Regions:
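Hydrophobic alpha-helical bundle signature of multipass membrane enzymes
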Residues: 34-236
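Residue-level signature of outer-membrane beta-barrel architecture
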Residues: 212, 257, 427-430, 496-499, ...
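Short loop/turn motifs that connect adjacent beta-strands in outer-membrane beta-barrel proteins
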Residues: 80-87, 145-149, 214-219, 261-275, ...
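Outer-membrane beta-barrel "beta-signal"
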Residues: 262, 272-288, 594, 730-731, ...
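Signature for the C-terminal beta-barrel architecture of outer-membrane proteins
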Residues: 511-512, 530-733, 746-758, 765-789
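Transmembrane beta-strands of outer-membrane beta-barrel pores
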Residues: 99-103, 113, 232, 430-432, ...
Length: 844
């Protein structure tokens, strides 16, 4: 069923033009045409326009056009080629994925009849406005002898009829129930008429034609914006599922392209016709800006190597506050750094050594910088890690409110005893497409429950603040042992497409939103990667004109959903949840980050994340928009509540006079605000220094950070421990019990220190120290954690690496244990890199 719909969408693709052997009127030959011809691939050739094709007048010519269109549309599957998999695979996968999640998404939408009727009315009025506007445009052009307006109205009407015929046929063929029918599952072949949406198809076909006829930014924004709003209203009104609207929107847009490309008279004006393939893929062989590329894992040796080069002044466009980076972006930075090192007569030997290893690792991507066919697949790593913990660690049950023994480890489970992970990672690219997967087996032993005093303290700092005075006390966590964990986990996995340096990915993805090494306040790898849809400007851009002073800029946005939240509070229903069972309706989380470099030595970034919707509050477009744009507050769980917002600001500055020796950086964070600049009394801070080399010891670097979530004065109505907590989402800023931000926690002060000696860019020995003090104003009697340890990593062959670490920890939380506790954590990891240093793929 999905495949057949994708073939219908192929009506707007190149198979039709290939069948005709022509480039549509108004088109210009693209570089991709020349490149394809040079490679021997069959492609369209230009011919002069047939004036008969421009007979755009009411009458038999319209009927003939529509018949030709329908013939081309329904015969297009026979002309599909292997190369069309570049767009069929992601579009088909996206549609199939949306169909699989349609029911869950629809369940999040408001069931209020008044709200649904409002959206239905909006979509009906909207489609009537499109139809009326199209007719009015034709009549106005006819009576004023404005041939351009007359053509625009006529072609828009033709496209609407074409797309309507296609979707009506598909409705009959698929018979899908609407969201309000039957058991609300949206079953196919059940006599319904939900798939696809005729409203969305007609709106997008008209918008597509009008946006080509009048290609200015404002007309396109109005046309496409109105079409998108109509489609969204059909979903919000529970008339269609999201996949219905997605497929019909694609059909409508492509049909509008096809009508315009065939019958537009270029002498009347309008925009240049460009096939959707050229619009999306630009050219072939592909240019780097259109090459799909996997992100480099956050625990890779590549980031410390590039950061050392940046601190030495050779990577001016590396954005440390927004990671991970794609492999292609790393290759671009390495290429630029190589040029700078070559041009610098005083470049240190350290820089050359780092570049040699990076050049070897990124040899395929460096070749692709000149353009190429990046059809490539790689088994990235196969690895196994054993971690032994003697003594009681701070682990599950204690991480959020007390602290944790192992930090920034993607939320992997651990307990006293022997812990094991074994897994592998790999990726594949083909043109603009990319897929990545990192799969692990994880094992952690069982553990006893925390004592009653600790469980009571957890109840007091998490749940009690939202219980009204005089109401029954909320439950404390049960005295239940923590079960052992033996599981397979897709730790990190996503699929995506890249266009013009914009990467669109969906799946579980790591994030690191700050320059610090201890873990950014806003988004770190302390919790497992969150399943999300992400839009990321993977390479920086520069604004035009006077705005160029902002320097290179990167932008990122995501929408995801959390797991493992147990409690939620509402001003309407009160506190609901359970300590033993996660909520069935987990909250959503969105966020954006923008970073800029006004100078090569100064980087700054701003970001916001918001938890919203979830149990008792349906996910709607209004709620989604409110989470992004609202700056006010409302009672928890009500229509006026924009969600649980957090804002961050970070910077990195290479200090004058000693730029190649000293870098200062900071990371400020605030809770329940959009920026720490609005109220520094509510802000927490990480401040750090980094020295990429020590005088007389060039292979040694040093880093120190101080951090706190314990501001000097906490003003009412904010209680102690309000960081990472919210009076609606009382399970906090967590995913499955792990803090998404910094390990410093809800109210604490701490420090982190590292000294690393680099034998080579990949072989090192490190000493580290970490200390945390939890305020007694937040946790009864407070608490402390002190870690000291060391680690080493070495590549014993070109494809095999070993790493190990030892950490001695003391912690003192009287509510957990009346005496100070100690534990020792030792870890050993073996990693096989099958493709390390090998070349892959083809380049031009």
């Amino acid at each position: 069923m999905v495949a057949s719909c994708m073939m219908m969408i192929a009506a707007g693709a190149s198979p039709i033009c290939r069948a005709q052997g022509v480039t549509p009127q108004g088109a210009t030959e693209k570089p991709s045409d020349r490149a394809t011809q040079a490679s021997g691939t069959n492609t369209a050739t230009k011919k002069s326009a047939d004036p008969g094709d421009y007979n755009n007048a009411l009458g038999m010519s319209v009927v003939k056009h529509i018949i030709k269109q329908q013939e081309a549309i329904w015969s297009s599957p026979a002309r599909l080629r292997i190369e069309d998999s570049i767009w069929l695979v992601p579009l088909g996968g996206l549609t199939a994925g949306m169909i699989a999640t349609d029911r869950d998404v629809s369940a999040q939408i408001s069931n209020t009849p008044k709200t649904q009727n409002r959206y239905v009315s909006f979509s009906n009025y909207g489609i009537a406005a499109f139809a009326g506007g199209t007719g009015a445009l034709y009549l106005w052009g006819h009576f004023t002898h404005n041939d351009h307006a007359r053509e625009a109205g006529l072609l828009a009407g033709e496209a609407a009829v074409d797309s309507l015929a296609v979707v009506e046929a598909l409705k009959y063929a698929t018979g899908r129930n609407r969201p309000f029918q039957g058991d609300h599952r949206g079953d196919f072949w059940s006599g319904g008429d939900s798939f696809p949406s005729d409203h969305a198809a007609v709106a997008w076909s008209v918008a597509s034609v009008l946006s080509h006829e009048y290609p200015g930014p404002l007309p396109q924004l109005l046309a496409y914006g109105a079409a998108a709003a109509i489609g969204a209203a059909r979903v919000e009104g529970k008339q269609h599922f999201p996949s219905d609207v997605l497929v019909s929107s694609a059909i409508g847009w492509l049909d509008g392209q096809l009508v315009y490309g065939r019958y537009h008279d270029p002498t009347l004006g309008g925009g240049e016709w460009t096939s959707w393939k050229d619009t999306l893929l630009s050219d072939h062989p592909f240019q780097p800006k259109n090459m799909g590329s996997p992100y480099v894992p956050l625990d890779s040796w590549i980031y410390p190597a590039l950061e050392r080069l940046e601190a030495l002044g050779y990577v001016p466009e590396g954005f440390l506050g927004q990671r991970p980076w794609t492999r292609m972006e790393c290759a671009r930075l390495i290429s630029d750094a190589s040029d700078r090192v070559t041009e610098d007569p005083n470049s240190p030997a350290t820089a050359s050594r780092i570049l040699r290893d990076l050049d070897k690792e990124f040899a395929p991507e460096l070749n692709f910088l000149g353009g190429g066919t990046n059809r490539n697949a790689r088994v990235e790593t196969l690895y196994s890690r054993v971690t032994g913990i003697s003594g009681q660690p701070l682990s599950d049950g204690a991480k959020y409110d007390f602290g944790q023994t192992i930090v920034n480890d993607d939320g992997r489970p651990y307990e006293q005893g022997a812990n094991l992970i074994a897994g592998g990672s790999g990726w594949a690219t083909d043109g603009p497409l990319v897929g990545y997967a990192r799969v692990e087996y994880q094992y952690a032993p069982s553990a006893t429950a925390l004592p009653l005093s600790a469980r009571t303290a957890i109840e007091q700092v998490q749940l009690l603040p939202v219980v009204p005075s005089g109401a029954p006390a909320p439950p404390i966590p049960p005295d239940t042992s923590i079960a052992s964990i033996s599981q397979a986990d897709l730790l990190d996995g996503y699929a995506g497409i890249q266009f013009d340096n914009w990467a669109f990915t969906f799946g579980k993805q790591e994030q690191w939103w700050g320059p610090d090494q201890s873990g950014p306040m806003l988004f770190s790898s302390n919790a497992a990667p969150i399943e999300m849809f992400e839009i990321n400007r993977v390479s920086p851009f520069t604004l035009p004109g006077v705005l160029r002073v902002a320097g290179p800029i990167r932008i990122q946005f995501f929408l995801g959903r959390l797991t493992g939240q147990n409690w939620v509070n509402s001003a309407v229903t009160g506190l609901t949840g359970s300590w033993t069972q996660p909520l069935s309706d987990q909250p959503f989380m969105d966020g954006w980050k923008i970073s800029l470099k006004p100078t090569e030595n100064f980087e700054m970034g701003m970001g916001i994340t918001t938890l919203f919707a979830g149990a008792g509050v349906p996910m709607t477009l209004h709620k989604f928009g409110q989470s992004i744009f609202s700056i006010g507050n409302g009672a928890p769980g009500t229509s006026g509540d924009p969600g649980d917002r957090r804002g961050g600001f970070d910077f990195t500055y290479r200090f004058p006079k000693v730029r190649n020796w000293l870098t200062l950086y900071g990371d400020a964070f605030t809770d329940d605000e959009i920026s720490p600049w609005r109220d520094w009394d509510k802000a927490s801070v990480i401040a750090g220094i980094y020295m990429p080399r020590i005088p007389k010891i060039p292979k040694l670097d040093f880093r120190a950070e101080g951090l706190y979530t314990d501001p000097p004065a906490i003003k009412p109505p904010f209680q102690h421990g309000f960081f990472y907590w919210n009076n609606r989402f009382v399970s906090g800023y967590t995913d499955s019990g792990n803090l998404i931000g910094s390990w410093i926690g809800r109210q604490g002060q701490g420090a982190d220190i590292w000294a690393t000696y680099w034998f080579t860019p990949k072989d090192s020995v490190q000493l580290n120290f970490r200390h945390e003090k939890v305020s007694r104003l937040f946790m009864p009697n407070g608490g402390t954690i002190t870690d000291a340890g060391g680690s080493a990593s070495a590549w014993v062959t070109s494809t095999l690496s070993l790493s190990g670490s030892v950490q001695y920890e003391t912690w003192d939380f009287p509510v957990i244990s009346p005496t100070r506790q100690t534990d020792v954590t030792t870890s050993f990891e073996l990693t096989f890199w099958p493709w390390s240093g090998r070349s892959a793929g083809k380049s031009q």
